[in-house]
Curated annotation (Swiss-Prot):
Part of a SCF (SKP1-cullin-F-box) protein ligase complex. May interact with auxin and auxin-responsive proteins. The keyword Plastid does not apply. Residues 92-93, 358-363, 413-417, 472-473 are annotated as: Interaction with auxin-responsive proteins. Gene3D superfamilies: 1.20.1280.50, Ribonuclease Inhibitor (3.80.10.10). One of its GO terms (cellular component) is nucleus. The myo-inositol hexakisphosphate acts as a structural cofactor. The keyword Nucleus applies. Its main location: nucleus. The record marks 150, 176, 388, 497 as: Interaction with auxin-responsive proteins. This is Transport inhibitor response 1-like protein Os05g0150500.
């Protein structure tokens, strides 16, 4: 039978659903909200791929340079919500040059042209200017949600444009941004008829806000569920705001400090007593311990408590947390100490996530391994940990691994580099190996302390589901990196700093990088020659190098043996970016 006959036979044998119009499949795809499920289904045939493209309503771009904005808009024309991430994660620790890039403007301009019905925008670690915010306000007539996380480049003038122009805004969520205060009363730009706000978070804003305007806004937005205040809100005004919004589910208190007065305490206690729906509480910066009992009436209902900026310590903090028996998420400073975590262990057996931050990265420290061991033993639902401390033992890590094999995220940050087991003086290889061998569902891991290549051999062999790995001051040869890149079959992001890893494992495992989202290496043993070879070998990867500002010579003039201070490699379908600053060079 010839080719034509084969095609005819196949067409005749095709199931009847093959002839259904694309509109039917587009409707069917609306029942697959998960991106992984949609991607798997779209690979079945060309009509399903076409239907998935046309019906997609949400788009997440993990690297703003992985695709060209206008190509993304053209490929997915019906998007209503977009999330775009910019600078590498190590930007949070000051390792990425401030002028690296990640401008939001190209994405907003492309969205304005191709997604006129866009309702939501989220940017993380990107440069968002006032002009960007003005374009958002002017371009999308039904815009409802703006989330900016760890962004910079804008001011309160841009926020004023959002307030004045986005008449259907439901969420304005500003987290950990650097915002210039232009002394503009931007909250007053919300029209008096505006009532749609559900989330308002301006906790990162440094300047003053007009309290009267804020109170009027909160009063008329009856569906407001989340309110996070900055540290300029006086404590007596917090009580007034709570009386006007007793329906709040999440509250960021702001500074929470004032001279103690019994009448103010009574007002706060009464205000919190009226918040019957409050489930998530944060803030309490510089909290005065005498006011903490005002929280007691809401403790039983709290599922999330973020005190990562609260410097309160001692019995007052422990009394407070011991009343929060339904907590699922707890963020605190190490001022809680081991005794406080023992109370958490006995009181909060529904805990799922624990983060403990250092109060003084250079101080003596208040926390040991004991607190984490206690929590792991008593909280059966615990699956995510970020723990800063100054000492650890292999025995403790092995115990934690046995107690909680259900960990999906384990990030241990021992503040002093190359710190061994403080009892045996041995490397912490055995402890971290126990974590990856016991916790088979682990997706995110950060390791620290004195570690040899043996721990990387264990990670490469056992961490099959690991997606993100952070390594600092660890390993003793190229073998460590080789074990990671030749194993860890699900790895998407790898970030490394101050490790003795060089060219050989990078080039030997170059193909692995095409299956990953990104690789960051800084203060390692890489050379320019290896980066050149990698770029030639893997043309679909963008290979960026960053050296000290004083070393901005053209790459062509530098020999292969030139050390590379910082390397960032990522997969892209857009080709080399065109906005590289002087401190960044593409190989």
């Amino acid at each position: 039978m010839g080719r034509g006959g084969s095609r005819a036979a196949c067409a005749a044998a095709a199931p009847p659903w093959h002839s259904l119009p694309d509109e039917v499949w587009e409707h069917a795809f609306s029942f697959l909200p998960a991106a992984a499920d949609r991607g798997a289904a779209a690979g079945a045939c060309s009509s399903w791929l076409r239907a998935e493209r046309r019906s997609r309503r949400r788009l997440a771009v993990a690297n703003c340079y992985a695709a060209a904005p206008r190509d993304a808009v053209e490929r997915f024309p019906s998007v209503r919500a977009a999330e775009v991430k910019g600078k590498p994660h190590f930007a949070d620790f000051g390792l990425v040059p401030p002028a690296w890039g990640a401008a939001a403007a190209p994405w907003i301009a492309a969205a304005a042209d191709g997604w006129p019905l866009l309702e939501e925008l989220s940017f993380k670690r990107m440069v968002v200017t006032d002009e960007c915010l003005e374009m958002i306000a002017a371009s999308f007539r039904n815009f409802q949600v703006l989330r900016l996380v760890s962004c910079d480049g804008f001011s309160t003038a841009g926020l004023a444009a959002i307030a004045a122009g986005c008449r259907h805004l439901r969420e304005l969520d500003l987290q950990e941004n650097e915002i210039e205060d232009c002394s503009i009363h931007w909250l007053s730009l919300f029209p008096e008829s505006f009532t749609s706000l559900v989330t308002l978070n301006f906790s990162c804003l440094e300047g003053e806000v007009n309290i009267t305007v804020l109170e009027r806004l909160v009063t008329r937005c009856h569906n407001l569920k989340t309110l996070k205040l900055n540290n300029a809100i006086p404590l007596d005004k917090l009580a007034s705001l709570l009386h006007k919004a007793p329906q709040l589910v999440e509250l960021g208190t702001g500074k929470f400090s004032a001279d103690y007065h019994s009448d103010l305490f009574a007002k706060l206690e009464a205000a919190f007593g009226g918040c019957k729906s409050l489930r998530r509480l944060s803030g309490a910066w510089d909290a005065v311990p005498d006011y903490l009992p005002a929280f007691y009436c809401v403790c039983e209902g709290l599922t999330s408590l973020n005190l990562s900026y609260a410097t309160v310590r001692g019995p007052e903090l422990i009394k407070f947390i011991s009343r929060c028996r339904n907590l699922q998420q707890l963020w605190v400073m190490d001022l809680i100490e081991d005794h406080g975590l023992a109370v958490v262990a006995s009181s909060c057996n529904k805990l799922q996530e624990l983060r403990v931050f250092p109060s003084d990265p250079f101080g003596a420290g208040f926390l040991t391994e004991r607190g984490l061991v206690d929590v792991s033993a008593s909280c059966p639902m615990l699956e995510s940990v970020l723990y800063f401390c100054r000492r650890m033992t292999n025995e403790a890590l092995i115990t934690i691994a046995k107690n909680r094999p259900n960990f999906t995220c384990f990030r241990l940050c021992i503040l002093e580099p190359h710190t061994p087991d403080y009892i045996t003086r041995e490397p912490l290889d055995a402890g971290f190996s126990a974590i990856v061998e016991s916790c088979r569902g682990l997706r995110r891991l950060s390791i620290s302390g004195l570690l040899t290549d043996l721990v990387f051999k264990s990670i490469g062999a056992h961490a099959d589901r690991l997606e993100m790995l952070s390594i600092a001051f660890a390993g003793n040869s190229d073998l460590g990196l080789h074990y990671i890149l030749s194993g860890c079959k699900s790895l998407k992001k790898l970030e490394i700093r101050d490790c003795p890893f060089g060219d050989k494992p990078l080039l030997a495992n170059a193909a692995k990088l095409e299956t990953m989202r990104s690789l960051w290496m800084s203060s390692c043993l890489l050379t320019l020659g290896a980066c050149r070879q990698l770029a030639r070998k893997m043309p679909r990867l963008s290979v960026e190098i960053m050296n000290d500002p004083g070393r901005s010579c053209p790459l062509d003039s530098l020999p292969d043996e030139t050390p590379v201070e910082k390397l960032y490699v990522y997969r892209t379908i857009a080709g080399p970016r065109s906005d590289t600053p002087a401190c960044v060079q593409i190989v």
